[in-house]
């Protein structure tokens, strides 16, 4: 019983540690053709929304995504799981991709960090 408690505490510790870190990697985005499909959270994809897919963060978490090539930022809400391509850390909605200026490139280097509220800077 004590062993199970230690394992649970260790898993919780790792989960909170990962969520507090800034991540660097590549972002891609959902094209408009995905509009209307359901995400892992059950929401429908809206191309103009400010949402994203992330492997670890809980649904509803707000993230600041910064395009490292041009410095543009967007605050997005996690509502899906992914990306499933190696080397990518976040999939953005079309609207979020437009906000950070990545529509032409398709895949760009980004930093991702958790924010407490939309007014966080």
Where are the language model's segments positioned?
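Secreted/periplasmic proteins
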Residues: 2-5, 18-121
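Hydrophobic helical h-region of N-terminal Sec-dependent signal peptides
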Residues: 6-16
